[in-house]
Amino acid sequence: MAKINDNYLKLKAGYLFPEIGRRVRAFAAANPEAKVIRLGIGDVTQPLTPTILKAFHDAVDDLASENSFMGYGPEQGYDFLIDAIIEKSYKPLGVDLKTTEMFISDGSKCDCANILDIFALDNTVAIGDPVYPVYNDTNVMIGRTGDADDKGYYKGLVYMPCTEENGFFPAYPKEKVDMIYLCFPNNPTGAVATKAQLKGWVDYALANDSIILFDAAYEAFITDPSIPHSIYEVEGAKKCAIEFRSFSKTAGFTGVRCGLVVVPDELEGTTSNGEKYSFNKLWLRRQTTKFNGASYPVQKAAAAVYTEQGWKETQANIDYYMENARIIREGLSAAGVTVYGGVNAPYIWLKTPAGLTSWDFFDKLLNDCHVVGTPGSGFGPSGEGYFRLSAFGNRDNVVEAVERIKKNLKK
């Protein structure tokens, strides 16, 4: 009889967002008249912009003609998109990349999971707490951990608490680690990292022969010119870091699916016999074996983001969401709620009212306000007592949700 991958059985029951969905569906079934406003999972609400949509349509039309039809594309991505990203998104930061160092994908969630294919299982991994669940769960699935303890920490992973006391920025691990997940602007806390803070991590990684897995999915929401958009703005980072980016929130591609990974040529790991080997070559080999590339229409649409008009439209949507963040942050703060994030990041991280756990507050908002958020404890034990709200909602719904919450908390 075929055996299963028992590592999946170590996972806590239900991925965070499906559990939220289950509770919301149950509430909606019991209260069909209720207008539920969802500010939980970070899905966007604004449509694709006209320039992006036209590029999409034109690319689909290309597939309708024998003369312009496109079949299998390059697994690494089309040069027209890679070149546009390097020219428009990295060069202005002072970061020079080769086209061979960038890989286009169908989204950064997949990349954050798939990157584990090129790392040995006996590497020691450090992740933040609270953390985007994908970092934690994919390491469990692949077999890098033991079982979870009563708090939810998995044996074999090093957890770095990100708390109110340390400004939601992790301290360096006391033990030796080989791989470090960093996400800035952060999901779920909305915290950002200064260049000096990132330099500290780069210096740490170089000194300890560690690799940083840097998730920059929300870099487009940074407005403070002093906050770095890429870890490669720090000298030496190409020798110790892989960077992930996404079009999901930046350009509304949550249903379109497109992302990218940067694996610098300078980045090397060690083989089992102690020799150095290129991670770039390993990732290329992995992609050419397991991935056929993001679709041609998707990559054409993504490239349109970097045209002058395309970026103007994209920035307008980003501004729309950041205004939502301001409304949530200032509205709840005025109601006496302690809030973090929502500046340079599209997530608001708030403290739950005294005496309420994260899931208690979830149920309170759902039942009393008909508003859905995300319990902080779902992101890790250090998230207990906190709650995440997303700025990706429709403006009218955001305003109404904030008013409902304020009214309820004043009772």
UniProtKB/Swiss-Prot annotation:
Record-linked InterPro entries: Aminotransferase_I/II_large (IPR004839), DapL/ALD1 (IPR019942), PyrdxlP-dep_Trfase (IPR015424), PyrdxlP-dep_Trfase_major (IPR015421), PyrdxlP-dep_Trfase_small (IPR015422)
Pfam families noted in UniProt: Aminotran_1_2
Keyword NADP: no
GO molecular function term, any single one: L,L-diaminopimelate aminotransferase activity
Disulfide bonds: none
Pathway assignment: Amino-acid biosynthesis; L-lysine biosynthesis via DAP pathway; LL-2,6-diaminopimelate from (S)-tetrahydrodipicolinate (aminotransferase route): step 1/1
Residues that hold substrate according to the record: 15, 42, 109, 132, 187, 292, 388
Binding residue positions for pyridoxal 5'-phosphate: 72, 108-109, 132, 187, 218, 246-248, 257, 292
EC number(s) stated in the UniProt entry for this protein: 2.6.1.83
Cofactor: pyridoxal 5'-phosphate
Catalytic reaction equation(s): (2S,6S)-2,6-diaminopimelate + 2-oxoglutarate = (S)-2,3,4,5-tetrahydrodipicolinate + L-glutamate + H2O + H(+)
Keyword flag Transferase: yes
Signal sequence, start to end: none
Keywords: Aminotransferase, Pyridoxal phosphate, Transferase
GO biological process entries: lysine biosynthetic process via diaminopimelate
Superkingdom of the organism of origin: Bacteria
Positions bearing N6-(pyridoxal phosphate)lysine: 249
Subunit structure: Homodimer.
General function of this protein: Involved in the synthesis of meso-diaminopimelate (m-DAP or DL-DAP), required for both lysine and peptidoglycan biosynthesis. Catalyzes the direct conversion of tetrahydrodipicolinate to LL-diaminopimelate.
Family affiliation: Belongs to the class-I pyridoxal-phosphate-dependent aminotransferase family. LL-diaminopimelate aminotransferase subfamily.
Protein name, as recorded: LL-diaminopimelate aminotransferase
Species this protein is from: Citrifermentans bemidjiense (strain ATCC BAA-1014 / DSM 16622 / JCM 12645 / Bem) (Geobacter bemidjiensis)
